[in-house]
Amino acid sequence: FNTIGIDLVAMCVNDLIVQGAKPLFFLDYLAVGKLDLKKSKKILSGIIKGCSLSGCSLIGGETAEMPGIYSKDNFDLAGFSVGIVSRKKILSKKNVRINDIVLAIPSNGIHSNGYSLVRAIIKKHQISKKIKKDLLAPTKIYSREVLKLVEKNLINAAAHITGGGLVENLLRSIPEELSLQIDLSKIKIKKIFKWLKKKKISDEEMMRTFNCGVGFCLIIPPKNLEKIRKVFPKK
């Protein structure tokens, strides 16, 4: 349970930085049937770590016991984050131009999308400890790197690759009159996605359900490519 909190924060702050906004603070909400202190402390530790990684403050939240709504072992976890950005630095599809480059930033794994399909698969197949670990890898938080680029005006637009995969999320980040060319051969596919593909999932469903190794995309002017590459580790 110590990585769920990271996922929660990541899904909020990664959506904020798509607009160029710096995450300022985060609040969480945990609803349970009966409070399990050991479990809730692990969840909270993940939220704290997520806030630390994203550079925002955890300023409050609520924990509610509702035995009439939730069974003993079930819980509901939610949260939200508020960010700030100067109007002149807002990232928008209006900024995108013909011949801009789309840069794919690697994911840690499947992040926080596609788990309904994953659960259906693992009900039918035995999985190793390594696969379990890979499936639970927390969502990567991109705020520190992306905000450096926003501050230097190096990005035109961005996309957080969540449900809907590369195509659906990227299309929301460009004007309707433009189109994209994606070179899939440039994407390094992690082993966890190769494992999932072997479970008889079609290419179309893989691309629509999972990030397939790309957690975030930047749409940039070609002249800024080398400057941006220096911000991210070569791996």
Role assignments for model-derived ranges:
Residues 7-8, 12, 22-115:
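Glycine-rich anion-binding loops of enzyme active sites
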Residues 13-14, 147:
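Generic structural signal for well-ordered alpha-helical scaffold segments
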Residues 1-6:
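Active-site mouth loops of central-metabolism enzymes
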Residues 39, 43-54, 70-75, 124-136, ...:
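Glycine-/charge-enriched secondary-structure boundary and capping motifs
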Residues 20-22, 117, 154:
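Short loop/turn motifs at secondary-structure junctions
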Residues 115-125:
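Short, compositionally biased
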